Structures are given as C-alpha cells and as structure tokens.
C-alpha cells in the first residue's frame, strides 16, 4: 500500500513510499514515467517522503513506523567512472524517536536546511544541516502522540504589503496531535529552543493532518483535518497575530489530509470515502466547496 507521494520542486521526479518498507523514485517525462531507483533502509512501513529545496542539492527525507528518519541524497558520479550517472546514498540516519515517525516536513528554504519530524512517542524533532553536519533538537509536544507537522511561511503575514515590515525570517510551525489539539511553535534565537506560543482547541478527536497556508498576504491560515469528521480553518489577522478564529467544515467520513494550493487560496481535503473536495473563501469570509473529485 502506498502511503505518500511527492513531486520534486521541478515536477520531474515522483517519490512514493509504501508498506513494503521501500521508497521508489520515478522519472516523469510528459505522460510517461519510469522507475529510476528503489531505496531500501527502513525496517517498517514508510509513511512519508519529502523533497528538500533544490538549493540544498537533490535530497529526500523519509519517515517510518520503525521510528527512523532517513535522509537520502543523489550523488552524481564522475563522468569518467564506468557507471557514470547518479546514485542515491543514505547520508543521515536519525533514530532517537522511540515510536513511529508519522510525518516529516522541510522548512521554507529561506530559513535554512531544516526538517521537522512528528512522532507517536509524543515528541517533535528538528534536524538542521549546517557546516557539513547534521544537528538536532528533540522536545515533547503532545502527550498521546504527534500525527502531523507543517511550517509557516518564512515571511510573516502582511510583511509584503506593510509600510513598516518587521524582521524577515521566522521559524514557526504547527503540530497536530492525538490529544485533539493543535500547537503553534516559535523558535527563540536567544535560547535556541522551540516554544509553544499558542494551543488551538476545537476538535473532539485525533488531529490527523495540519497544513499552514503559504499565503503571506494580510492573514495566516491553518487547516486541520480530524478523526471527528471535520476540517477547521483557523485564521489570524496580521493586525492581531496572537488571535485565531476557526471555521468548521463538516463531512460524512473520517478525514486524513489537507493540502493548500501553491498560492494558498484553495484547500484540498481528502478522507475515507476516496473523494477529494476543493474549498475556497468567498468575499464574506466563508469557506465554500467549489468542486468534488472522485476516483
């Protein structure tokens, strides 16, 4: 069973991961695709794959039921080598989590080469590649396990349209847990720690997925999908950044994933009924369904 799939930055490669403990990389050419590589290294089902920004090289992260996060890199062989071309190697094996690592998420590239990891052991880890080595922080986040994690845009909302923009880069992310909560974390450069700045309550069952909208206009949006058959869209205005309000969207099935369009104005929701629905905010600030996509 395939659990996750992701296109690289250029849309030329697709990585998939599966219950068979492997990751497969396909080359996409027009309407066709070709299996280019099968990566083996995990000892359990692989839940998540995530491509890093190409400015850091061709790097892929994967997380698994085995409690590990693996970082893979494509190394280009010497043109004079008999096996000229490229080969994938495992460059980092992070195994400090004591239970399944359910999701990995790369930070916006402006913030650096940072990977956040969400685990069923209740902890979040943040890996950073700097000066040719990997460092990590690991900290407790949700008592009953962390299911999902998503970074905020590097620029604060309103910074593009403000006459007095604030400091440029922020390191901030949201987590969703089996305690039914969302938590927002901010990095403190002085203490070099991630601290909870907000806890968002509203769901009555596990939060399965969270997604921070990439939009950096006047508002911030976070979508959360829950076992309670609802999606909540949390909104915070740049004029009052600590205040979050939510709007609830109701469904007939358990919900698994939420995903924003690149511009951050359309939300895709998928659940247990094999449907994807697309939602958009109207001029009154209400979220409306604009399309259903069925298999």
UniProtKB/Swiss-Prot annotation:
InterPro entries: G-protein_beta_WD-40_rep, Sec13/Seh1_fam, WD40/YVTN_repeat-like_dom_sf, WD40_repeat_dom_sf, WD40_rpt
Membrane-related topology note: Peripheral membrane protein
GO molecular function terms listed in the Swiss-Prot or TrEMBL record: structural molecule activity
A GO biological process held by the record: positive regulation of DNA-templated transcription
Subcellular compartments: Cytoplasmic vesicle, COPII-coated vesicle membrane; Endoplasmic reticulum membrane; Nucleus, Nuclear pore complex
Transmembrane spans: none
First and last residues of every WD repeat: 1-36, 41-82, 96-137, 141-195, 202-244, 250-289
A cellular component term, taken from the record's GO annotations: GATOR2 complex
UniProt keyword list: Cytoplasmic vesicle, Endoplasmic reticulum, ER-Golgi transport, Membrane, mRNA transport, Nuclear pore complex, Nucleus, Protein transport, Repeat, Translocation, Transport, WD repeat
Pfam families in the cross-refs: WD40
Main location: membrane
Family (UniProt): Belongs to the WD repeat SEC13 family.
Assembly mode: The COPII coat is composed of at least 5 proteins: the sec23/24 complex, the sec13/31 complex, and the protein sar1. Component of the nuclear pore complex (NPC). NPC constitutes the exclusive means of nucleocytoplasmic transport. NPCs allow the passive diffusion of ions and small molecules and the active, nuclear transport receptor-mediated bidirectional transport of macromolecules such as proteins, RNAs, ribonucleoparticles (RNPs), and ribosomal subunits across the nuclear envelope. Due to its 8-fold rotational symmetry, all subunits are present with 8 copies or multiples thereof.
Function text: Component of the coat protein complex II (COPII) which promotes the formation of transport vesicles from the endoplasmic reticulum (ER). The coat has two main functions, the physical deformation of the endoplasmic reticulum membrane into vesicles and the selection of cargo molecules. It also functions as a component of the nuclear pore complex (NPC). NPC components, collectively referred to as nucleoporins (NUPs), can play the role of both NPC structural components and of docking or interaction partners for transiently associated nuclear transport factors.
Protein name: Protein transport protein sec13
Lineage: Eukaryota, Fungi, Dikarya, Ascomycota, Pezizomycotina
């Amino acid at each position: 069973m395939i659990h996750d799939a992701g296109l690289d930055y250029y849309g030329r490669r697709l990585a998939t991961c599966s219950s068979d403990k492997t990751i497969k990389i396909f080359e996409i050419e027009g309407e066709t695709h070709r299996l280019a590589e099968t990566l083996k290294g995990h000892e359990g089902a692989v839940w998540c794959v995530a491509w890093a920004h190409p400015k850091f090289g061709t790097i892929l992260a994967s997380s698994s039921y085995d409690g590990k996060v693996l970082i893979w890199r494509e190394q280009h062989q010497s043109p004079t080598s008999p096996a000229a071309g490229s080969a994938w190697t495992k460059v980092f094996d992070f195994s400090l989590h004591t239970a399944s690592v359910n999701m990995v998420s790369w930070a916006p590239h402006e913030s650096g080469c940072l990977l956040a990891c969400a685990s069923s052991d209740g902890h979040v880890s943040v890996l950073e590649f700097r000066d040719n080595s990997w460092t990590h922080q690991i900290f407790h986040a949700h008592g009953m396990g962390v299911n999902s994690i998503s970074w905020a845009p590097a620029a604060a909302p309103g910074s593009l349209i403000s006459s007095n923009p604030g400091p440029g880069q922020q390191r901030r992310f949201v987590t969703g847990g089996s305690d039914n909560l969302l938590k927002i974390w901010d990095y403190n450069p002085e203490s070099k720690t991630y601290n909870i700045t907000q806890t968002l309550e509203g769901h009555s069952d596990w939060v399965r997925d969270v997604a921070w909208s990439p939009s950096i206009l006047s508002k911030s949006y976070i979508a959360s999908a829950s076992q309670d058959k609802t999606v909540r869209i949390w909104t915070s205005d740049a004029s009052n950044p600590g205040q979050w309000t939510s709007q609830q969207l109701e469904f007939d099935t358990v919900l698994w994933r939420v995903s924003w369009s690149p511009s951050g104005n359309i939300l895709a929701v998928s659940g247990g009924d094999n449907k994807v629905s697309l939602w958009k905010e109207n001029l009154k600030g209400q979220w409306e369904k604009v399309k259903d996509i069925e298999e």
